[in-house]
Regions:
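A detector of single, family-specific signature residues
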Residues: 1-400
Length: 400
């Protein structure tokens, strides 16, 4: 019985081996995250002659090379939630923090919870790729939102009032194309109304936008009443051009990532089942599968709900028992975000005779707020998802 505590950092780890009773077998030493370093560590653990369990704290992506190397060589690995490890280490009165001491504390954790250590398994390559792409999708979405905010701020300063006119009309890039074409209120006014109307209609027809004389008149009237803040100068034009370029580049990158996610998700057996669920489209289906991963790794539907962080743990002390509890939020925040978008889709489309939408409406009828009702609906949705997908896999014994 040998607990191996590994304190992971970027590019290297500190390793400590400990037996019951606090007997240190391997004094804390450093291992580099290289093939040579991992090979030496594996050889050391295999030569111990003991039942070895390696324990690591979850550290984002830093621990992944160590976990991969140990699992490929058949060594038991358990990656522990960082909050659990922090609370275990905080039992000490003295506040001492070094890599060597952390490795010893992790080894002690392995001994204290030897029977409760859960083995870590590497997910299938498809799920790993999907999760990687999903993270990049969210990053690109965040950048896209910022790019749109920046562009809108610039647009308000050179072409005030144009956003309100363009937002209600067809054309995903109509506003940015319009700003790139006409650049500034002064430029529109210098053209004159007759010339601008002809030019706008010709441009709209070429771009495939609605060719509307009335729209051209509204734009010219707005330009006459608008007060631009930035001058019609070369510096302003550079800022506008670059803002639009960034906006289109980030949007194209996000679309490319989503396309690849859809292609990968379609190779999974459960994709068609998830896609057939009400209000789950081509965008939400791959994102949902990416965040949940292989549903068979959860021992029950409650485990999936806890993984999403929407569970509400009970709170009771003496005669007091809390009735209204907040969700824990100790789980995958990306899954919560995606799940909330799924619930928004349910509320928008209102599928008839659907148990999840009926449940949301029931909660609203009980006086619950819209957000609370949707979180309750997400809880039910994940239970349904777990039941359908696990039952689907049970019907495919060859895959199992």
């Amino acid at each position: 019985m040998l607990s191996i505590g590994i304190d992971v950092s970027k590019g290297k780890s500190t390793v400590c081996g400990m037996k019951p009773g606090g007997e240190i077998v391997y004094t804390p030493f450093e291992v580099q995250h290289t093939r040579e370093g991992m090979s030496e560590l594996v050889s050391l653990l295999r030569g111990s002659g003991e039942e070895v369990r390696a324990v690591l704290e979850s550290t984002g992506s830093y621990h992944c090379p160590v976990v991969t190397a140990l699992l490929e060589n058949g060594i038991f690995v358990s990656v522990v939630n960082s909050l659990r490890m922090k609370r275990f280490c905080s039992q000490s009165i003295r506040k001492v923090k070094t890599d060597r001491i952390d490795a010893m504390q992790i080894a002690l954790y392995g001994l204290a919870y030897w029977q409760e250590l859960q083995p870590t398994r590497l997910p299938e390559d498809t799920y790993r790729e999907l999760q990687l792409l999903a993270r990049q999708y969210y990053q690109m979405t965040s950048l896209l939102i910022k790019a749109k905010v920046d562009f809108n701020a610039i647009c308000d300063q050179v072409l005030p009032g144009m956003q309100e006119l363009m937002n209600d009309h067809a054309g995903r890039h109509k506003l940015s194309d319009f700003v790139l074409r006409y650049r500034h209120t002064t430029h529109i006014l210098e053209m004159g109304e007759t010339r601008f109307r002809k030019d706008y209609c010709k441009w709209a027809e070429k771009k495939g936008y609605r060719n509307c004389e009335r729209m051209a008149a509204l734009i010219f009237a707005t330009a006459q009443n608008g007060i631009p803040v930035l001058p019609n100068a070369p510096s302003t034009q550079i800022v506008i051009t670059e803002a639009i370029r960034v906006l289109h580049t980030v949007e194209a990158s996000r679309d490319a990532i989503l396309t690849q996610m859809q292609a990968l998700a379609k190779t999974l057996p459960e994709y068609s089942l998830v896609r057939e669920m009400p209000c789950i489209g081509d965008t939400l289906a791959p994102r949902l599968i990416a965040e949940i991963g292989d549903v068979r790794r959860f021992h029950s539907k409650r485990a999936l709900i806890a993984y999403a962080g929407i569970d509400a743990p009970p709170y009771q002390s003496g005669k007091f028992c809390a009735n209204n509890r907040h969700i824990s939020k100790r789980g995958n925040r990306y899954l919560r975000k995606t799940g909330y978008e799924v619930m928004q889709s349910y509320v928008m489309h209102k599928p008839a005779n659907d148990p999840i939408f009926t449940f949301i409406e029931k909660k609203r009828g009980e006086g619950k707020s819209g957000k609370l009702a949707m979180v309750a609906g997400l809880n039910k949705f994940l239970r349904v998802y777990y039941g359908k997908v696990t039952e689907f896999y049970r019907s495919l014994p060859a895959i199992e």
